[in-house]
């Protein structure tokens, strides 16, 4: 069923949407957008505590998702199942589940919410949803 959903998403592709999704997915590469936000928040005294909470969430996320779960579950990527689909980004070499981009995004959003960052967590949630969607749109995750 999952592969059928991803295959259906392929019908949504347009040159403009392809570029937008590539840009959005690259914001999540190595959690870069969340790491930058964390550093900025740590540097600002008013948001330092929230930045530390975010840093802790990202560290736990990397250990739990990228080091433990990915290797334990060892799920192949969709482009390895359906080799006919043209992948528009560099093919990741690690396993598919869980998505590091998505996990880092939602770990950050959760940290912002729990830290009481009312002005930040909602836009961060919107970005996290877009990053998660981009990973499926680009055929690198289920």
Residue locations for each model-derived region?
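N-terminal transmembrane-helix/juxtamembrane module of multi-pass inner/ER membrane proteins
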Residues: 1-32, 66-93
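Membrane-helix interface segments
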Residues: 16-17, 46-51, 116-123
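Alpha-helical transmembrane segments of integral membrane proteins
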Residues: 23, 32-35, 53, 119-126
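Short helix-capping/hinge motifs at transmembrane helix termini and TM-loop junctions
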Residues: 29, 44-46, 73-74, 135-142
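Hydrophobic, aromatic-rich transmembrane alpha-helices
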Residues: 34-44, 107-113
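Interfacial segments of alpha-helical transmembrane regions
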Residues: 37-63
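Small-polar-interrupted transmembrane alpha-helices in polytopic inner-membrane proteins
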Residues: 56-72, 120-134
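Membrane-embedded catalytic cores of phosphoryl/pyrophosphoryl-handling enzymes
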Residues: 86-142
């Amino acid at each position: 069923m999952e592969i059928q959903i991803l295959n259906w998403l392929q019908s949504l592709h347009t040159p403009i949407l392809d570029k937008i999704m590539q840009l959005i997915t690259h914001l999540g590469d190595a959690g870069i957008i969340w790491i930058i936000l964390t550093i900025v928040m740590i540097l600002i005294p008013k948001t330092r505590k929230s930045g530390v909470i975010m840093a802790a969430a990202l560290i736990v996320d990397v250990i739990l998702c990228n080091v433990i779960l990915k290797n334990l579950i060892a799920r192949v990527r969709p482009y390895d199942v359906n080799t006919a689909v043209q992948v528009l980004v560099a093919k990741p070499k690690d396993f598919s589940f869980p998505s590091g981009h998505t996990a880092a995004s939602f770990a950050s959003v959760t940290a912002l919410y729990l830290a009481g960052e009312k002005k930040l967590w909602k836009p961060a949630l919107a970005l996290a949803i877009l990053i998660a969607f981009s990973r499926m749109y680009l055929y690198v995750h289920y």
